[in-house]
Amino acid sequence: MGSLSIWHWLIVLLIVVLVFGTKKLPGIGKDLGNAVKGFKEGMNEGAKDGQPPAKDAGRIIDGEADKK
């Protein structure tokens, strides 16, 4: 019950086709692919900068320290 079977995915695909039509689906897929590609390039660009990620100072706020 927790996972989606192939039938669930087919029903979702059918609803998407009915809502958007077959003409718009390639454009939506292309836009989604470009978004994922841009995200991956941005993540790789951040890693190539050579700067280590900033560390959190680990401050303790008085309200949090009393609640433990």
Curated annotation (Swiss-Prot):
Database matches in NCBIfam families: PRK02958.1, tatAE
Subunit structure of this chain's protein: The Tat system comprises two distinct complexes: a TatABC complex, containing multiple copies of TatA, TatB and TatC subunits, and a separate TatA complex, containing only TatA subunits. Substrates initially bind to the TatABC complex, which probably triggers association of the separate TatA complex to form the active translocon.
Region: Disordered, residue numbers: 42-68
Function of the molecule: Part of the twin-arginine translocation (Tat) system that transports large folded proteins containing a characteristic twin-arginine motif in their signal peptide across membranes. TatA could form the protein-conducting channel of the Tat system.
Name this polypeptide is given: Sec-independent protein translocase protein TatA
Keyword Secreted: no
TM stretches of this protein: 1-21
InterPro entries, sorted: TatA/B/E, TatA/E
A GO term from the CC aspect: TAT protein transport complex
Listed GO biological process terms: protein transport by the Tat complex
Key words of the record: Cell inner membrane, Cell membrane, Membrane, Protein transport, Translocation, Transmembrane, Transmembrane helix, Transport
Family according to the record: Belongs to the TatA/E family.
Basic and acidic residues composition bias: residue spans: 56-68
Keyword hit for Phosphoprotein: no
Pfam families membership: TatA_B_E
PANTHER family: SEC-INDEPENDENT PROTEIN TRANSLOCASE PROTEIN TATA
Membrane topology: Single-pass membrane protein
Subcellular compartments: Cell inner membrane
HAMAP family in alphabetical order: TatA_E (MF_00236)
Gene: tatA
GO molecular function, one term: protein transmembrane transporter activity
